[in-house]
Regions:
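Short membrane-interface helical motifs at transmembrane helix boundaries
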Residues: 96-128, 318-339
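Residue-level recognition of transmembrane alpha-helices
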Residues: 9-12, 16, 43-46, 90, ...
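Interhelical loop/hinge segments that connect adjacent transmembrane helices in multipass membrane
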Residues: 1-9, 188, 200-242
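Signature of the first transmembrane helix
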Residues: 3-64, 230-253
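Helix-terminus/linker motif at the lipid-water interface of multi-pass membrane proteins
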Residues: 21-40, 109-116, 172-179, 236, ...
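Membrane-interface helix-loop junctions in multi-pass transport and translocation proteins
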Residues: 163-197, 327-332
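Small-residue-rich hydrophobic transmembrane alpha-helices
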Residues: 39-99, 136-154, 250, 263-327
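Cytoplasmic helix-loop-helix junction between adjacent transmembrane helices
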Residues: 114-115, 119, 126, 133-160
Length: 340
């Protein structure tokens, strides 16, 4: 069982760690363009997209659990329906984001105190990258579905490919074609759709036989769709609470001065690192527990929960000890400012 957990958790951890690299690459590129306003624009735009997409993370989490349950039951029709529902809901949400992009941007600038120059470049970045919403949310559905099918390697391959495409495209647009923030935004946009197309290609190649189980008539009706929205609404509100807490943490620190804000930002980096690793085991839990529930394997389910609980305790204690004794050293790698 531990082997199964690690086989699912480790690729998921790698995938999670690559997520912030997309934004980091953008910042690194504009950081060489000679204006701090470019960096500020990417920071503001990146933060805004992170909050938006984090809120809709239920498309991945809910999909993985429900796919795993259908897979455990060997109900291949419901397996396919779950993917189609997730991608369909993602496309509908994307349409809403497109329609509301101007109010969203104006609301963000009310909350974010930035210079007019930063707002101008951030608006350009946002108005380009928002067209990638279908790719991002659609990929959430595919990633959750792959994990539910006990396959966390495909999301890892997709995440790595996205980073490579983003780096190459952004470098070409900025340093070859002479673009600025818009070049970085276009590179990110291309990488997002490259990830979605890769997910679809992998699905066709390795799961194409499931096309025979597509049932359009039962896609949006019955108990299954009620459960789909019931589970995802719970996850949605849970995520809203997390976003509210982290936003409060950042905004409160900002009101207490630059030093406190900097300290809180560094501490959040340590917290984020821990979260990415723990989330890998959470994904493994979603896939395995869902499969055991679907197969009505109570013995396997109890053993899975017990082992995941032990992994959680072990990792929590390990990180607590690590941060307690080496916390200052980790912070020293992130900054040399003695006031922080």
């Amino acid at each position: 069982m531990n082997r199964k957990i690690l086989q699912l958790a480790i690729p998921s951890i790698v995938s999670n760690i690559t997520v912030p690299l997309l934004g980091l690459v953008d910042v690194a590129i504009v950081g060489h363009l000679g204006s701090a306003s470019y960096i500020g624009a990417i920071a503001v735009g990146g933060m805004l997209f992170n909050m938006i997409y984090w809120i809709f993370g239920f498309l991945r989490m809910g999909t993985s659990g429900m796919t795993a349950q259908a897979y455990g039951k060997r109900d291949l029709t419901e397996v396919v329906r779950t993917l189609l529902r997730a991608v369909g809901v993602g496309l509908l949400i994307s349409l809403g984001l497109w329609i509301l992009q101007s109010p969203i941007l104006r609301g963000a600038f009310v909350l974010i105190d930035a210079t007019e120059e930063v707002k101008r470049w951030a608006s350009l970045y946002f108005n380009i990258c928002i067209w990638g919403a279908p790719a991002v949310l659609g990929l959430y559905g595919f990633a959750g579905w792959f994990i539910g099918m006990q396959n966390s390697r495909f999301p890892m391959f997709i995440a790595i490919t996205q980073n490579i495409v983003n780096i190459v495209a952004s470098l070409c647009f900025v340093f070859v074609l002479g673009m600025k923030v818009e070049g970085v935004a276009l590179g990110t946009l291309i990488a997002q759709y490259a990830g979605l197309f890769m997910a679809f290609a992998l699905w066709l190649k390795y799961y194409g036989r499931l096309k025979a189980y597509i049932d359009w008539d039962g896609l949006w009706g019955g108990e299954a769709i009620r459960r789909f929205f019931s589970v995802n609404s719970d996850i949605f509100f849970r995520t809203l609470c997390l976003v509210a807490v982290t936003t409060f943490f950042t905004s409160t620190g900002a009101r207490q001065g630059d030093v406190i804000l900097a300290v809180n930002t560094l501490l959040m980096q340590l917290f984020t690192l821990f979260s990415y690793i723990m989330d890998g085991f959470a994904y493994a839990g979603e896939a395995l527990a869902g499969r055991f529930i679907g197969a009505k394997n109570d013995v396997g389910l109890r053993r899975c929960i017990r082992l995941l609980f032990l992994w959680g305790i072990g990792l929590s204690l390990s990180f607590t000890i690590l941060y307690a004794f080496l916390g200052r050293d980790f912070l020293g790698l992130l900054t040399n400012d003695t006031s922080v």
